Amino acid sequence: MRGALALVLLGLSMAGCSGPIETRVSSAGEEQPIAGSFMLAPLPDNSADELTGAQALLVEGLLTKGYHHADDADMMLTVGISDRPAQLTVKNGAQILAPGKQPKMWQSCADREYRMTIELTRRADGAQLYSGNASEYHCNATLTETLPSLAKRLVADIERPRGPKLLVRLGKD
């Protein structure tokens, strides 16, 4: 009896740290496969390690999909990341760009929103072939821990941009 009670209490205490993670993906671009060669937009000299890591994760994912990384390529890949308190609403004038998130019941820490953005442009004419962002709310996970999931979602979406969608995975909140 005590053992069962201990397991229930342990499960309840861990419920705030892990569970379903919602990944919000929004994208636009060409609807046909655009695999080819790509080069990376240069990062600022003082770039955070997380940005360099995000870029490396995206390169790895694109290589597995048949893209080719080159110093002089047909396409330019630009990568960005952000980290903000999730309860803040981001606006441009009256337009809400990112609504604030309300805490969940029994939540013991404040959420942060981690976001990765990518843009793939054709170098010859500057045409945008793909633009996408993936974001997640986390209470305990760090930006670094979240980057692999965000990169995976964007790489999976790059050849089939479909506007906004919501995907769910299990992981560290």
Residue spans of the language-model regions?
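A structural "domain/chain start" motif
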Residues: 15-60, 64-65, 164-173
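Surface-exposed short loop/turn segments
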Residues: 65, 80-131, 161
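Acidic helix-start/capping segments at beta-turn-to-alpha-helix junctions
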Residues: 70-87, 171-173
